[in-house]
Amino acid sequence: MEPRVSVAEAVSSLTIADAFVGACEGPAPPRPALPSRFICSFPDCSASYNKAWKLDAHLCKHTGERPFVCDYEGCGKAFIRDYHLSRHVLIHTGEKPFVCADDGCNQKFNTKSNLKKHIERKHGNPQKQYVCSYEGCKKAFKKHQQLRTHQCQHTSEPLFRCTHEGCGKHFASPSRLKRHGKVHEGYLCQKGCSFMGKTWTELLKHMREAHKEDITCNVCQRMFKRRDYLKQHMKTHAPERDVYRCPRQGCGRTYTTVFNLQSHILSFHEEKRPFVCEHAGCGKTFAMKQSLMRHSVVHDPDKKRMKLKVRAPRERRSLASRLSGYFPPKRKQEPDYSLPNASAESSSSPEAQLPPPAALLTVC
């Protein structure tokens, strides 16, 4: 009886040729999968990408869409990528998460690219410079792109050419070429009209003027052009309004708006009233320019600096009406929006009954 041969011995006894023969007889290994490409579906565009998010960002150039909007009050800037938005938000927060690790530096930056530029500019190799080869020049630059842009001055021919069909314009820097490219691409209005803006800002301006969407307060039905104006207005309906206290020692005065607090500090504590009324015989001074503008209506009611609305006084309700929950029907009254002549001195005029515009901002 022949002795048993272990698996290890059997494998070790195989020659290299036997191993190749055995491999050929077995099942063929699967072919390596080709990397998938994400292709732009717009006509006359051959762009393709290896990542889906890259294609999404590219499609925004065709549609003009900027889906990532900054929600900070009064900002409203929009971006194609979420990374660009998160980088922009650092401007509002003041956060600078990228710190230079060089000894004795510790400078902070809000983007990684700014940190990289700082390192190259301050701590980079001073020997690595790009020197202009034109006779008699010898100017040196830290970036090759800067050298190419500089050499356009010697050749008098701009280096960067627009490749759009029928254009062919030349530019001295890539940033100017990129800015020019928006003229051909444009931003199409998505509200059903044929407007094409050359820049995103131009499209936003068109949207504000041609497609106005008034925003209404659901409490008092007052209308606003911007959402941040409505947000500021909603504070007037809050059950407890914010109170701003004067920070100066020993003062303790409080105001319901930051504007009135600033006006109080400038005029009362710092005695600064740089804005003077130039109307003949007046000479009143104000701490804030807006206060002067409101005051000017007293001398010239035709100025459209401030719209005065005469509201009808609120009707008094009886105790029985309040307890029963019955609301009597409101009487329609046409308010008189006309402003009286500034020269009228009759005490029975509406101007005598209303406080002067300057008194709307109480300065203590």
Curated annotation (Swiss-Prot):
**What biological-process terms (Gene Ontology) are attached?**
ribosomal large subunit biogenesis
Compartments (UniProt record): Nucleus
A single GO molecular-function term is: DNA binding
Output the Gene Ontology cellular-component terms.
Answer: nucleoplasm
Q: Superkingdom of this entry's organism?
A: Eukaryota
- Which PROSITE patterns does its entry note? ZINC_FINGER_C2H2_1 (PS00028), ZINC_FINGER_C2H2_2 (PS50157)
Task: Spell out the SMART domains in the cross-references.
Answer: ZnF_C2H2
Q: Which SUPFAM superfamilies match?
A: beta-beta-alpha zinc fingers
Q: One matching Pfam family, short form? A: TFIIIA_zf-C2H2
Q: Which keywords appear in this protein's UniProt record, sorted alphabetically?
A: DNA-binding, Metal-binding, Nucleus, Repeat, Ribosome biogenesis, RNA-binding, Transcription, Transcription regulation, Zinc, Zinc-finger
The segments annotated as C2H2-type zinc fingers are 38-62, 68-92, 98-123, 130-154, 160-184, 187-211, 215-237, 244-269, 275-299
InterPro entries in the record, alphabetically?
TFIIIA_Zfn-C2H2, Zinc_finger_trans_reg, Znf_C2H2_sf, Znf_C2H2_type
Give yes or no: UniProt keyword Oxidoreductase. Answer: no
Specify where the region named Disordered lies, as residue ranges. Answer: 299-364
Q: Where are the compositionally biased (Low complexity) regions?
A: 338-352
Record function comment: Involved in ribosomal large subunit biogenesis. Binds the approximately 50 base pairs internal control region (ICR) of 5S ribosomal RNA genes. It is required for their RNA polymerase III-dependent transcription and may also maintain the transcription of other genes. Also binds the transcribed 5S RNA's.
Protein's name according to its UniProt entry? Transcription factor IIIA
